Amino acid sequence: MIAKDELIEYAMYVNNYYGTPKAYVQEQLAEGKDVILEIEVQGALKVKEKFPDTPLIFITPPTASELKRRLTDRGTESPEVVEERMKTAAKEARFMESYDYIILNERDRLEECVEAVHGVILAEHEKSTRNQAFIDHMKEELKGE
């Protein structure tokens, strides 16, 4: 898929390649659906490069210690993997300013985090740059007034 340019983005994350199929995303957008990609920083920046109007949302725990606590408390990762994930998080944090929105995923407040993401999506729909057809139509209707 990489060689055939069938991915919007791809990157290696924790020693594995991950990517987003271009055809699927294009189909969803053509149907008027919103597409949310859960991807790491490398991939997000590649998407933004190819599609500059794409809003990027960085979702993060409020502190590094909270991130480590969550990774540890899951009990699914070895201490070595947790440390590797923390190093990756430190690298990713260097790019937070490249994102359009930062949303804190507070402990025991998942619903608030989801609502914040939904709010961003709703606001993005209302941007004037996404509503040029309406703007043109309204201006045309008001010409004779």
Question: What role is predicted for each listed range?
Answer:
Residues 27-30, 48-52, 93-96:
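Conserved catalytic network of the ASCE P-loop NTPase/AAA+ motor domain
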Residues 94-145:
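NTP-dependent small-molecule kinase module
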Residues 1-8, 70-77, 119-123:
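Conserved AAA+ ATPase "sensor/coupling" helix adjacent to the nucleotide-binding pocket
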Residues 42-43, 109:
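Alpha-helix capping/helix-boundary segments
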Residues 46, 66, 112:
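Phosphate- and divalent-cation-binding pockets in alpha/beta enzyme and binding domains
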Residues 1-35, 42:
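ATP-dependent small-molecule kinase phosphotransfer cores
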Residues 35-40, 49-73:
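Conserved phosphate-donor/acceptor-positioning beta-strand/loop module used by diverse small-molecule
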Residues 79-94:
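Conserved catalytic-core segment of NTP-binding enzymes
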